Amino acid sequence: MNIENAQVQMRKGILEFCILHIISRGEVYASDMLDELTSARIMVVEGTLYPLLTRLKNSGWLDYKWVESSSGPPRKYYVLTDEGKIFLEAMQATWFELADSVQTIIHRSEELSRGGTSKS
């Protein structure tokens, strides 16, 4: 596996978490999600986002409503369900545990590469 494939796999693993976090702030239009992800340097295309949103809705974690737009057709705005909020809280706890574990491993590896000793 080359680095590009590894990066894609890592991003796929956190994309659902990021999407739920963005939606947790309130009603969000899909285009705004794409903009926020892009500004965070997470490149996602509509062909990836919309199937993910459908899967999250089918899981019961989000819902949507149609809102009339003065500049075109109605827009679909996404919002977390109560079940989605609970799921996001659990994902966030898992994220912090995982990030802490990864940081511990990286820190130990750096210590060892500098000639230090590993503390288990």
Please place each PLM-identified region on the residue numbering.
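Amphipathic alpha-helical dimerization/coiled-coil segments
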Residues: 86-120
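Short E/K-rich amphipathic alpha-helical oligomerization segments
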Residues: 63-69
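Basic, amphipathic "hinge/linker" alpha-helix immediately C-terminal to the N-terminal HTH DNA-binding motif
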Residues: 70, 74-92
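Positions that flank functional sites
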Residues: 52, 71, 103
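Glycine-centered, phosphate/nucleic-acid-interacting loop/turn motifs that mediate DNA/RNA or nucleotide
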Residues: 60
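N-terminal helix-turn-helix DNA-binding core of bacterial DNA-binding proteins
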Residues: 7-48, 54, 67
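Short, intrinsically disordered or compositionally biased N-terminal tails of bacterial proteins
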Residues: 1-6
